[in-house]
Structure formats: structure tokens, C-alpha cells
Design a protein with these regions (language model features):
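Non-catalytic interaction/Regulatory regions outside core domains
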Residues: 2-138
């Protein structure tokens, strides 16, 4: 009878640690002129709405070429290269397209955007319609 290492039972989903505690905004931005413009617009939106983002337990998970190490996004989660690749694979993100995926506290995909400018206000409004968020609201 052989032994099975404990790590064989670990959840390979790098985002599972956030399940039931946070909503996640997975951001895939390629290193292109358009990608840099998209990232700057998103960074400005996140800065302007930072209190709204925090109130919704929303963490930002960059998994693309941008932002680079040392660049900052409010409430960002730092993943290693292997984890970023695994998240992109699991979510079916395309390499050369800016994409955003909203993941609920239950771990399910709630929305996807592939835009030159992401609609953060629309995503925050969508979160407010979710049953778990409604239960959190005073």
C-alpha cells in the first residue's frame, strides 16, 4: 500500500483561500499601449471608488502582464507567476485581450468584461444586487 503525500489533496485553485471572505476582481491586462491605457483608467477608478471597493470586501487580483511588480493597485493580491498562470487557465483568459472577471464570495464567476475601459461602477452596482451583499448591508 503506497502513501499519498498530503499536498496531493491541496486545492490547486490559488483563489480558494478567499472563498466566503472576499469578492475578487481578477484583472488581466496585456503589456500593450492599449493595455497600459486600460490599466491607468482602472487604477483611477479604483482610487476614486476605494471606499466602495473596501465596503464590498473586494480584492483586486492582477494576473496579466500588467501591473508589473512594484506597480500598485488598491487592495491588490500578489500572486506568483505560476499562480497567475493557473488563474488565467481556469478562467479561460486570452493572452492579448484586457479582461476583468468578478468572482463572488462563493467562488463563482459573476461577471466578465473585455473592454478598453472597464465599468467599475457597473460591477459595484451588480455586487449590490447579490443576496450575500444585500445581507451585509445595514
Amino acid at each position: 500500500m503506497g502513501c499519498v503525500p498530503l499536498w496531493a489533496f491541496a486545492d490547486p485553485d490559488p483563489l480558494s483561500v478567499y472563498r466566503w471572505t472576499h469578492r475578487l476582481l481578477v484583472v488581466h491586462v496585456p503589456d500593450t499601449d492599449a493595455g497600459r491605457a486600460t490599466l491607468e483608467a482602472l487604477r483611477a477608478s479604483l482610487h476614486d471608488r476605494r471606499e466602495d471597493v473596501r465596503a464590498r470586501d473586494l480584492l483586486i487580483v492582477p494576473v496579466g502582464d500588467l501591473p508589473r511588480a512594484g506597480d500598485s493597485l488598491p487592495t491588490a493580491v500578489a500572486l506568483g507567476a505560476t499562480e497567475r498562470l493557473e488563474v488565467r487557465r481556469r478562467l479561460g483568459l486570452q493572452d492579448r485581450v484586457a479582461q476583468l472577471v468578478l468572482i463572488g464570495k462563493d467562488g463563482g464567476v459573476k461577471a466578465r468584461q473585455s473592454e478598453a475601459v472597464f465599468d467599475l461602477a457597473g460591477l459595484l452596482a451588480l455586487i449590490d444586487t447579490m443576496p450575500m451583499r444585500r445581507a451585509e448591508m445595514p
